């Protein structure tokens, strides 16, 4: 069931009963990327899957990346209703979750950061600048195949044509200006100086084949956080919860149960 939170600015699907668990989607995908794992998680948690600001029915934020993190903190505070919350972010959603937790230390008791990081390498920053420029000049169709390659390995794409058709359509529904702004923010973002102050337990996951946020980014993130553990998912790329849902659920299960 969809509900509006944060004074009507954030739309989210809500299902299940139990402690609140929030799932933040990536930039190159949408909240449907969690469809394969949400039903299982809803057996133990109240699962809240928002559309990030500027996606779907959620209102865009014009003030930059920190303001997006603040908006999502409003969502978590509103939807959790005072209960201890766990936040899981994939890709861009992981960066948002990390920035949110750094700016609002009491907002979550645990974080799962899947295929994210604290800062991109210079080649990674250049890739975002190039995608933003291409999207501005020729529209999202010009970079759709680049986006899909960043999400899934070619072998996976070849084996799942129907899924890939759905993922391309989802990407093309993204607001181009929201996409360009997010690319610009990620090209400049560097959260590393703040990581030492984040005390909550963090599970850092990454697909071994992830080209969008390669494993060295997750290794660096886990090493710089005071209370983090790292898991590398074999055979997975940037959206492991969609590519290998059972593997992903097994990887996060113990960490979630510890809460």
Kindly label every feature range from the protein language model.
Residues 8-59:
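Conserved HGGG/HGGXW glycine-rich cap/lid loop of the alpha/beta-hydrolase fold
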Residues 98-103, 107-138:
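Flexible "cap/lid" loop of the alpha/beta hydrolase fold
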Residues 219-239:
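Catalytic histidine neighborhood in serine/cysteine hydrolases
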